[in-house]
């Protein structure tokens, strides 16, 4: 019999770090209808949107997130809370908040700030990132990252033209297939990675606030810097893991957002699914 604590241990670190997802910079619970509609110019000032996601493995819920986004003109302000749930909460008590700000510039969502704070057991941890013109100008982790040899250092060049894990997955595209024709440059405060997408079909998707077709992208995780070379979890994600992300278009906005992600881990497939994607007022 597999002990629950053994199952959760490989998952919980990234779950805590991103707050709502595991591994590879694929967290997207904070992606909001509000920010997406803002990017298309369709949202009015002070519109409020709410998104909710469930994270599960072996069919068991291990975490939840709830995000509210306020849109004012071209700017968005996102506030969310995430926590472990169900059986996972017995073995791994994580509770935290995330705050992201940014704006729509030239048809792209450009982040300004990313603030993550959470309590993992008895330990308080935080990550802050500041951006200017799409480049990272400051990043801090508390407590500081423990760099274990052989460590791949992050260079200044690595931090140009990147997004935080939440903003990276807001994608403007002419059609569903075009969503997958790209590579996403992501920085989470520690690790710089590329998420290379490729088209893998379509599927229908229904949740509270949305019904329609989604496009499935296969995703390949490519670590660039800010990680321990040879670490088993990183090697598995980059060389063996099977990952897909399903994106859905919001009306005629021309913006696509993830509604389902499946991430193969060493102990099973992690599933992240939107359970609500709607406007509040």
Tell where the protein language model's regions lie, with residue ranges:
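N-terminal secretory signal peptides that target proteins for export/translocation
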Residues: 1-19
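Acidic, serine/threonine-rich low-complexity disordered tracts
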Residues: 44-133, 176-281
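Sec-dependent N-terminal signal peptides
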Residues: 14-32
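A charged, solvent-exposed segment within the mature domains of Sec-exported extracytoplasmic proteins
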Residues: 137-200
């Amino acid at each position: 019999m597999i002990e629950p604590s053994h199952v959760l241990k490989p998952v919980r670190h990234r779950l805590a770090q991103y707050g709502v997802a595991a591994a590879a910079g694929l967290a997207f619970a904070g992606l909001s209808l509000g920010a997406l509609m803002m990017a298309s110019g369709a949202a009015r000032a002070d519109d409020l949107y709410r998104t909710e996601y469930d994270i599960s493995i072996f069919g068991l819920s291990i975490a939840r997130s709830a995000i509210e986004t306020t849109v004012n003109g071209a700017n968005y302000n996102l506030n969310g809370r995430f926590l472990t749930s169900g059986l996972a909460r017995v073995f791994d008590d994580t509770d935290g908040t995330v705050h992201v700000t940014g704006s729509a510039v030239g048809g792209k969502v450009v982040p300004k700030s990313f603030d993550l704070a959470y309590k993992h057991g008895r330990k308080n941890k935080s990550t802050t990132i500041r951006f200017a013109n799409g480049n990272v100008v400051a990043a801090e982790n508390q407590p500081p990252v423990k760099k274990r040899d052989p460590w791949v250092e992050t260079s200044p060049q690595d931090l140009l033209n990147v997004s935080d894990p939440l903003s990276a997955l807001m994608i403007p595209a002419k059609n569903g297939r075009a969503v997958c024709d790209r590579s996403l440059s992501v920085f989470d405060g520690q690790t710089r990675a590329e998420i290379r997408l490729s088209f893998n079909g379509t599927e229908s998707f229904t949740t509270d606030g949305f019904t329609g077709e989604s496009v499935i992208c296969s995703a390949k995780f490519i670590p660039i810097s800010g990680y321990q070379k040879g670490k088993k979890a990183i090697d598995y994600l980059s060389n063996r893991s099977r990952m897909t992300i399903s994106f859905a278009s919001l009306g005629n906005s021309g913006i696509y957002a993830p509604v389902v992600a499946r991430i193969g881990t060493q102990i099973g497939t992690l599933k992240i699914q939107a359970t609500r994607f709607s406007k509040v007022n």
